[in-house]
């Protein structure tokens, strides 16, 4: 307890004494409080779980929702062991033999699988998060244990959303907005590109030449084609023959988070996922 209190105070003092702008410090430290709130908890066996948030007296939306926690970074850097435990849950306990990753980890909470269509940003994003956890920890045993299920998850995504394997996702994609996007869209495709690059790098390190080559070729094809299809001269847009065919499509609109895959690529040193001038 004394060690935890000492390190916590030192961390807090270091942040507030830094040269970061006051608005950045306030935003970062305010959001860190979620980690010590009722949003986060551990069960008897030590496994970590988190709601999407907390209501007045109950948690809101359980099960480490992959396409919500995909946006979080703090725990991976402050409490990396807990974050690695989440990846173990995602891949070892919530990804089936077909590669379908349930985006809510419910098996240990109520004994039942969530049994919903997979989320493109959650499933592809969790592959990038696996790469992040390994880079932070350097734990080769951790990576090797999760790698087979990561391969299944990525190949499942290709089957579901890139049915013609031209490298561009255009299937029915459940996303963080709790809707399905159709056609070629920036949110899904940037998450996919980040997953391909992450998988390529992990395969290279593990000596898996077959998958390293496969994901490199897919990435090169996907990057060029997705960029040319979605770039309208000013920004990336959703490509859909009839934007009114389905509800909740954004079409020529811009999503605030449509470049989340690139955000991860920058954090992980993976470079630009599509034309750098367009991304900028």
Model-derived features: positions:
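Hydrophobic, small-residue-rich alpha-helical packing segments that form membrane-like cores
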Residues: 155, 166-231
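Short cytoplasmic-facing helical segments at TM-TM junctions of multi-pass membrane proteins
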Residues: 1-2, 210
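Substrate-binding groove/exosite segments of carbohydrate-active enzymes
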Residues: 2-159, 165, 170-174, 251-279
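Carbohydrate-active enzyme catalytic cores, enriched for enzymes
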Residues: 200-206, 217-280
């Amino acid at each position: 307890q004394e060690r935890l209190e000492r390190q916590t105070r030192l961390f807090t003092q270091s942040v507030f004494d830094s040269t970061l702008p006051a608005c950045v410090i306030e935003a970062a430290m305010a959001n860190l409080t979620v980690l010590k709130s009722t949003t986060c908890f551990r069960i008897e066996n030590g496994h970590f779980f988190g709601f999407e948030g907390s209501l007045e007296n109950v948690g809101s939306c359980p099960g480490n929702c992959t396409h919500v926690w995909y946006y979080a970074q703090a725990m991976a850097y402050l409490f990396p062991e807990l974050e690695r435990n989440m990846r173990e849950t995602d891949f070892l306990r919530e990804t089936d033999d077909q590669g379908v990753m349930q985006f809510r980890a419910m098996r240990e909470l109520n004994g039942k699988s969530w049994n919903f269509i997979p989320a493109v940003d959650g499933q592809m994003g969790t592959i990038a998060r696996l790469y992040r956890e390994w880079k932070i920890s350097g734990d080769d045993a951790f990576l090797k244990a999760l790698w087979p299920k990561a391969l299944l998850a990525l190949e499942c995504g290709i089957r579901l959303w890139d049915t013609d394997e031209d490298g561009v996702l255009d299937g029915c994609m459940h996303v963080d907005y709790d809707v399905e996007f159709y056609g070629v869209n920036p949110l899904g495709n940037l998450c996919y590109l980040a997953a391909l690059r992450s998988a390529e790098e992990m395969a290279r390190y593990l000596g898996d030449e077959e998958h390293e080559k496969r994901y490199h070729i897919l990435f090169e094809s996907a990057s060029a084609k997705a960029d040319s299809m979605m770039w309208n001269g000013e920004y990336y847009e959703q490509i859909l023959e009839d934007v009114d065919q389905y509800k909740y499509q954004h079409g020529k609109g811009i999503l605030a988070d449509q470049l989340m895959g690139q955000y991860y690529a920058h954090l992980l040193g993976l470079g630009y996922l599509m034309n750098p001038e367009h991304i900028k």
